[in-house]
């Protein structure tokens, strides 16, 4: 059941219109499974290349690189070694996706 919910959320994220929001929702979705809360934010200890992220959000690598720079500049995400750190709260769209997936 969890696998089908994850698939529904991943598909919904990939169809969201804005790449920066797709990336932010994906990172928070991954943080829900692998993230650890730290004083600076939620640390996601996954080696995720820009190409892999592009594949996961149905985009191109250059667009992902630009969107990650924008998210970093806005203070939503930062890179610490091989880990990503998410700052603030998860996007509200992610809660809506999760709720819709659970109603299935």
Residue ranges and their predicted role:
Residues 1-24:
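A small-molecule sensor/coupling module
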